Amino acid sequence: MNATKEKPYFLRITLFIVASLALIFSGFLLNNDKTILKFLTLMLCTSSGVVIVYRLNDASGNSLSFMAQIVKFLQNKFHQFVIAQFIVFCLPLAFFYLDRQSFFMLSMAGLLGLFYTVSVRINGKSQALKKIFLVKNISIGLAWGLLVLVGAGETTHPFLFPLFCFVSVQVFIGSVIRDLPDVNYDEESGIRSLPRILGTRKSLLVLHLMNALSCLVFIVDKELNWSLILGLVVVFWRFVNLLGCAFQPRNLIWSQFVNLGTCLVIFLMVFINYRLGLI
């Protein structure tokens, strides 16, 4: 990979790390057992996990078998370093400093993130699961939604599950937005993404509807009505994001920066409500 390709890659992976940490911190604010070691462990494990999952996904582009993907992934010295420090530092730290709930949810998030990168044999041909309609988007939505539960640990706050559902829907929307600039690539690669199947315009209409309905999770329980404002602010941010994509679907400002910024807005709103004593 040359220098010109390295720069956008590291920028993109940095955005993913920042967005994932924003969701971890959103859940951590609800955690009843906040310690600096737990905080640092969550940061290290999440950052390493994001690099591993998304780089392994890049290695699956040619419908290689899962073992072939692993071999290709490990040929990169940076990947070797990330895996080594994950085994030597992250796993022991997670085992000793994370509660069972956080450890389990973090493992599930990692497995879901890897799930859509796996290739299976269908009719004698290797088929990447991410090529199947919506499999990738649902996996990403659930995996990132689980990050909230990872941060929260064994907390049983009534706001936690609605927040998990809300984040999962919003990240699902975001994953489809990231597919918008790749319609031609998906066509060539046989990936059945939503924009490829429905087209950009209809896909955006579906996403607008999902965005509008996503905040309903905060009004199911009357005791959580205060959180509706949180949901509406995020929904408005996403509405602006989708409008930008409607006019410039291939512009990375809308499909990457503003899109991933949704996770930061979620954290900001959770933090404000936390400081106000509502959480």
Give the positions of each predicted feature.
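Select subsegments of transmembrane alpha-helices in polytopic membrane proteins
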Residues: 10-17, 76-86, 134-142, 201-208, ...
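Intramembrane alpha-helical segments
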Residues: 71-155
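The first (N-terminal) embedded transmembrane alpha-helix
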Residues: 7-29, 141-147
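Membrane-embedded alpha-helical segments that form the functional core of polytopic membrane enzymes
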Residues: 23-56, 103-111, 156-177
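Extended hydrophobic alpha-helices typical of membrane-associated regions
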Residues: 65-73, 124-133, 202, 220, ...
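Solvent-exposed interhelical
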Residues: 45-96, 169-215
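Short, Lys/Arg-rich, polar N-terminal cytosolic tail immediately upstream
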Residues: 1-8, 123
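Hydrophobic alpha-helical transmembrane segments in multi-pass integral membrane proteins
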Residues: 143-155, 213-217, 264-279
